[in-house]
Swiss-Prot record:
The gene is ttdT. Coiled coil: none annotated. One of its GO terms (cellular component) is plasma membrane. This is L-tartrate/succinate antiporter. The keyword Cell membrane applies. The lineage of its organism: Bacteria, Pseudomonadati, Pseudomonadota, Gammaproteobacteria, Enterobacterales. Catalyzes the uptake of tartrate in exchange for intracellular succinate. Essential for anaerobic L-tartrate fermentation. GO terms for molecular function: antiporter activity. InterPro entries: CitT-rel (IPR030676), SLC13A/DASS (IPR001898). Belongs to the SLC13A/DASS transporter (TC 2.A.47) family. DIT1 subfamily. It is found in: Cell inner membrane. The keyword Transport applies. It is a multi-pass membrane protein. It catalyses: (2R,3R)-tartrate(out) + succinate(in) = (2R,3R)-tartrate(in) + succinate(out).
Length: 487
């Protein structure tokens, strides 16, 4: 992009801030709260347009608020308190997100992903599944799903998982059967495999708390607004029936709705076997990595009463360093991990300020008045449907979550009858599952869309069909199962 032609991306967030700031302060709000909301909204616009990287947008927003904290962050009553030093208080607020346990959990999970990549364990697992299940096209779809499922708990970047590990493997499969991109032969087997790649990425992103960065952002927003939270085990158990159903149903459903011409063949297993032979036997580093990952998953699921999930991740990373699975250079040079670390911490800080200034409680009361007279169940379902469908308007899961999740949480808090843990888990699942709707919804989407095997009309049609199925199943399990295990 040329700066001269993209100047509007820089000006738009500033224009939004100015417009909101000039609007008269709504009744029930203090002026500093309204000005804070103006800057917060400008940050969200910046995250959507990305004139600079998202982490930079968030850090600039925090800097503006902290420097102007007497007018944006603190009320006159707070400033008048004896001994109140706004300089120290604004600094404490600015760095608050970096001490949040959610931040360190996702950072540790990124290091797990680095271990998978460096040892080759992730690639080996995918190749083994392809070799064992690749004789039939339907089973190959299950191999793609199971590969994503195994990698998802310890790969919080669905882009790294889908576009960095799975896609480079499965893109080699269609040409083995003369199924070429942008050609009539693409439907032979390539279209089915590529659709399975993106749909499996979306499904697994919803199954585990640590499978997608916005999941952890949501929990951070939930905690800052209500002091309630969902553990790794809570998320996993709450999603369990839906997870099992989708993992088993989706490959078959894709096989029926987007049937491949070629139903079976031996070329794929032979290719996978050749690749595995080139990798050699399971090495000691892979074995150590596998042992640590199994241990981490066990503690995440069953150890919540004894050790925090973030501490599990932190300790496992330390062991990975001691066992030389990864090096210190791998940590300091992991740009993706540090990028997510900074923008996620910054967004949690900004969301905390939205709550501290009183905007969330005001917005909740406003919604409570408009929603009175409707049943909590009806309101909850309506909010989930609206949140899900608004996915069409966002090309970033991070911007989507940052913009809409605080409003969803405020709406739920406005009606005490709505079970917040259940509602937030449904919102979290909608982030991942709703990513299937468009070819721009999440990081791997453009990769699979641009593979040449998924025509535009097919992608939008399948996205709508699968998206509707996912939404219906989410609402059903959210109402019938999640309250049983979360309340």
């Amino acid at each position: 992009m040329k700066p001269s032609t993209e100047w509007w991306r820089y000006l738009a967030p500033l224009a939004v801030i100015a417009i909101i700031a000039l609007i008269p302060v709504p009744a029930g709000l203090e002026s500093h709260t309204w000005l804070y909301f103006a800057v917060f909204t400008g940050v969200i616009v910046g995250l959507i347009l990305e004139p600079v990287p998202g982490a930079v947008v968030a850090m600039v927003g925090i800097s503006i608020i902290a420097i102007l904290s007497p007018w944006l962050l603190f009320s006159p009553e707070q400033l008048a308190q004896p001994g109140f030093k706004f300089t120290a208080k604004s600094l404490s607020w600015a760095v608050f997100g970096f001490s949040n346990s959610v931040i360190w959990l996702i950072f540790a999970a990124f290091m797990f992903g680095t271990g998978y990549e460096k040892t080759g364990l992730g690639r080996r697992i995918a190749l083994i599944l392809v070799k064992k299940m690749g004789h039939r096209t339907l089973f190959l779809g299950y191999a793609v799903m199971f590969s994503e499922l195994i990698l998802a708990p310890v790969t919080p970047s669905n882009s790294a998982r889908g576009a960095g590990i799975i896609y480079p493997i499965i893109r080699n499969l269609p040409p083995l059967y003369q199924s070429q991109p942008n050609d009539s032969s693409s439907r032979s087997i390539g279209s089915y495999i590529m659709w399975m790649g993106i749909v499996a990425d979306c499904v697994t992103s919803a199954i585990f708390l640590t499978a997608m960065a916005p999941n952890l952002l949501l929990i951070g927003l939930m905690k800052s607004a209500s002091h309630a939270t969902l553990s790794w085990g809570d998320w996993f158990l709450g999603m369990l029936p839906l997870s099992i159903l989708l993992v088993l149903l989706v490959p078959w459903l894709a096989y029926v709705l987007y049937p491949p011409v070629l139903k079976s063949g031996d070329q794929v297993p032979r290719w996978a076997e050749t690749e595995l032979q080139a990798m050699g036997p399971l090495c000691s580093r892979e074995k150590r990595m596998l042992g640590l990952m199994v241990g981490a998953l066990v503690l995440w699921i069953f150890g919540g009463d004894y050790i925090d999930a973030a501490m599990v991740g932190y300790s496992v990373v330390a062991l990975m360093l001691l066992l030389r699975i990864i090096s210190w250079d791998d940590i300091v040079s992991n740009k993706a991990a540090w990028n997510v670390f900074f923008w996620l911490a910054s967004l949690i800080t900004l969301a905390t300020g939205l709550n501290n200034t009183g905007f969330i409680s005001w917005f909740g009361k406003l919604l409570a008045g408009s929603l009175s007279g409707y049943s909590p169940t009806m309101v909850m379902v309506a909010l989930i449907v609206v949140f899900y469908l608004l996915r069409y308007f966002f090309a970033s899961a991070t911007a989507y979550t940052s913009a809409l999740a605080p409003m969803m949480i405020a709406a739920a808090l406005a009606m005490p009858e709505i079970p917040l843990p259940v509602f937030c888990l449904m919102v979290g699942a909608a982030i991942g599952l709703g990513s299937i709707l468009t070819p721009y919804a999440t990081g791997p989407s453009p990769i699979y869309y641009g593979s040449g095997y998924l025509p535009t009309a097919d992608y939008w049609r399948l996205g709508a069909i699968f998206g509707l199925i996912f939404l219906v199943l989410l609402v059903i399990t959210g109402l019938l199962w999640m309250p049983v295990v979360l309340l």
